[in-house]
Amino acid sequence: MSLPLAEPLKPQLARSAKELPAGEGWCYEPKWDGFRTIVFRDGEDVRLQSRNGRPMNRYFPEVVEQVLALPAQRLVLDGEIVVEVDGVQEFDLLSQRIHPAASRVERLARETPAGYVAFDLLAEGDEALLALPYRERRERLRTVVADGDGPVGLTPATSDRDAAGVWLTGASEGVIAKEAAAPYAPGERTAMLKIKRVRTADCVVAAFRFGKEEGTVGSLILGLYDEDERLREVGHVSGFKAREKRELLGRLESYRTYEQGSGGPSRWKSDEELVWEGLRPALVVEIAFDHITGHRIRHGARFLRWREDKEPRECRLGQLRT
């Protein structure tokens, strides 16, 4: 390739923030739940580069074809590869693509095709655009991808803080705020903020794991009822203080079934395959979380409060889709 920017190229990163920044100098975009990917195109040669510099072409052949369908022959894009089903981003389906079997990748590309959503233009033709302010790069990006009406998507953007706030309550993963006058800084956490969408759910406490210290609880395993009235595991909550870990065992005592397990097709489990002990489905907690994969909370949830006013059967799986 003879592009003005060479690979590998580190993407610009964002710092975490709790709320949307205010002021005329900010622009806002929705946060996507996919694989951050830098796209290099020089004629018929397209290369997809992951956030950590690894090649991604073999996992997403349909994205390569989407880039080749763009009129622009020489460019470098920053964006995200995503899989959407019925308007919902499905990170678990996306993750299944990272597999050594080419036949599996080809099948998944047909069944659940991925798409590329562009949110920055880093080079066009012989011109590197890193030094240009974000607002100018954005305008040029709109032209290159035909406002997202072509084969490659264009992330929405607004300078209206109130309008951006909708992305903290809708189907997106949150908001990325960018300084409109800032250049693109590869590998730097500057001029960009990420504000995650924090969701809450009321969950049944279906089991627990013991803590490292005797007589303590390490985590609570959470469940929600599906349409068939089955209690399905959706994740866990931990991070309790030392005093709370000791008090929890007393609170759970009268609900213990003494059924134990460490995984299996129909048992409560986590990636760590730690031993759990079952509980009667009678206790309800409210938790906060920010990511889901399918019907599971992808990262550990945060405990908010006990819900003595809530019946376990009111804790439905549909909460994870709202």
For each feature predicted by the language model, list its residue ranges.
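Catalytic cores of nucleic-acid ligases and guanylyltransferases
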Residues: 1-322
